[in-house]
């Protein structure tokens, strides 16, 4: 049920590495958001670095916008190492894994949003997320490249999702009460406009 989405990826090699990372960890849904190179998943460098995950490149889908790509998702996690003045609720990756596992047990679809290589997620992308998440890293140098971040998330998420099966636990049937991502984005934009109007937030 997990989805890996890459907004505005400019490097075919990173797309190939992403496909390899998520397939290695048992995931199979790669969504590419408005890539700078149309057909980026079919580029030679992407195919080379995907190694045995070429099938994920072949089944990956390109979307014109992040909004379009997450319409079927109930939980949208935006990965970023930067603090933001405004945006969705923030949590660390450990807490996010718990939430993802619960959503998965409830048959919800989850989107993991990774930003472009040079700039990371923009505020517009984060406004469409239900949660903002950071990975615990060296405070003086917290920047992972795209493929590294995806592999860390995919590996640790796989560990979390397998915990119940290893321990023989029954799935928790309690439903996670999550707001619609589009509704969250509209609410955050309404708040932002209000804060600008009263001079609290500098546009």
Show the residue positions of the predicted features.
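Histidine-anchored nucleotide/phosphate-binding helix
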Residues: 15-26
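Short beta->alpha connector loops at strand-helix junctions that form conserved
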Residues: 7, 33-34, 80, 133-140
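An accessory alpha-helical subdomain
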Residues: 167-203
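Short, small-residue-biased leader/transition segments that mark boundaries at the very start
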Residues: 1-6
């Amino acid at each position: 049920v997990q989805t890996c989405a890459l907004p505005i990826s400019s490097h075919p090699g990173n797309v190939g590495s992403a496909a390899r990372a998520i397939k290695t960890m048992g995931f199979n849904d790669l969504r590419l958001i408005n890539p700078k190179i149309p057909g980026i998943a079919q580029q030679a460098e992407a195919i080379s670095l995907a190694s045995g995950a070429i099938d994920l490149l072949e089944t990956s889908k390109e979307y014109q916008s992040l909004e379009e790509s997450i319409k079927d998702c109930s939980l949208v996690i935006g990965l970023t190492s930067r603090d933001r003045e405004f945006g969705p609720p923030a949590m660390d990756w450990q807490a996010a894994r718990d939430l993802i596992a619960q959503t998965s047990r409830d048959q919800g679809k989850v989107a993991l949003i990774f930003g472009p290589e040079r700039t990371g997620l923009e505020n517009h992308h984060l406004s469409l997320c239900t949660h903002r998440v950071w990975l615990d890293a060296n405070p003086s140098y917290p920047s992972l490249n795209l493929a590294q971040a995806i592999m860390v998330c995919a590996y640790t998420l796989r560990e979390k999702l397998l915990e119940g099966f290893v321990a023989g636990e029954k799935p928790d049937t309690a439903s996670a009460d999550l707001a619609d991502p589009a509704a969250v984005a509209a609410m955050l934009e309404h708040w932002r406009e209000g804060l600008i109007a009263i001079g609290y937030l500098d546009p």
